[in-house]
């Protein structure tokens, strides 16, 4: 699920230079004019703009290497915080698929339809997470604070098959970017239902098994003050969880 996340600007001092695993050139590219224009777009809802300080949109766009003309799948996009940004950056020559799983479609389709009505380059796509297909190869598959949910039995997802389908859907050289709430070291996926967290190393190993190359991690929404012991919806930590952001690349 999607509680608000914590921004790079608030965390840099606490993290220190050792934690900055993204090259400086990637961080400076967050100032790309297209990213700034998307963030400043007057059509964005005010409640989404109010969350920018905590969701690091420019850093996320830069880390995901979003560019004009790309085709992007935003998996379970919710209200479309990132979908709107992607739509503005890829422009009329690109396309964004708002992928809504069949199991949650009744509740989530209306929100996706708001996005398709507002952006002609966005379309809603329904399907099973472990049977995803797209009409053209993708440049980017993006998943924010959702991966852990897909391990919960009620979602009925074969996560290994999901990752394999994402690998297949991407162009050679395409990216798979995942944001999620960090769990305590050594806990793997054991906290997915109790705390809504997943251990980053566990997720990384799962994705690599699908053939992806782990390329980089961004500290943009990290919070070292989070000890990983609380449910992400607990008021003591909600909106300030420690989150990892991993970038995987399909070889080619």
Regions found by a protein language model. Give the residues of each.
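A short SAM/SAH-binding and catalytic strip from SAM-dependent methyltransferases
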Residues: 139-160
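A short acidic, Gly/Pro-enriched loop at the edge of an enzyme's catalytic core
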Residues: 119, 132-142
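Core SAM-dependent methyltransferase catalytic element
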Residues: 225-252
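Conserved Class I S-adenosyl-L-methionine
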Residues: 188-216
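Conserved class I S-adenosyl-L-methionine
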Residues: 68-78
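Conserved beta-strand signature within the Rossmann-like core of class I S-adenosyl-L-methionine
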Residues: 173-181
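Class I SAM-dependent methyltransferase Rossmann-like catalytic core
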Residues: 35-63, 67
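A short glycine-rich, Lys/Arg-flanked "PGG" loop and its adjoining helix->strand segment in the class I
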Residues: 87-88, 157-172
């Amino acid at each position: 699920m999607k509680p608000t996340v914590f921004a790079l600007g608030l965390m840099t001092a606490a993290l220190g230079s050792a934690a900055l695993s993204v090259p400086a050139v990637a961080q400076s590219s967050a100032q790309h004019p297209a990213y700034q224009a998307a963030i400043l777009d007057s059509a964005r809802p005010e409640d989404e703009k109010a969350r920018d300080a905590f969701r690091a949109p420019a850093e996320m766009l830069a880390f995901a290497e979003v560019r004009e003309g790309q085709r992007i799948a935003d998996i379970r996009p919710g209200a479309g915080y990132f979908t709107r940004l992607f739509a503005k950056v890829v422009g009329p020559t690109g396309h964004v698929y708002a992928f809504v799983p069949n199991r949650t479609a009744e509740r989530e389709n209306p929100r996706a339809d708001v996005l398709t009505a507002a952006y002609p380059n966005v379309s809603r796509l329904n399907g099973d997470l472990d049977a995803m297909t797209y009409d053209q190869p993708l440049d980017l598959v993006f998943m924010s604070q959702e991966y852990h949910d897909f391990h919960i039995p009620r979602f009925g997802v074969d996560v290994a098959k999901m990752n394999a389908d994402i690998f297949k859907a991407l162009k050679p050289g395409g990216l798979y970017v995942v944001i999620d709430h960090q769990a305590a070291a050594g806990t793997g996926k054991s906290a997915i239902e109790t705390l809504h967290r997943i251990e980053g190393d566990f997720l990384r190993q799962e994705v690599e098994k699908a053939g992806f190359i782990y390329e980089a991690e961004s500290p943009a929404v990290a919070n070292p003050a989070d000890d990983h012991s609380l449910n992400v919806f607990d008021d003591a930590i909600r909106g300030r969880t420690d989150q990892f952001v991993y970038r995987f690349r399909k070889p080619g």
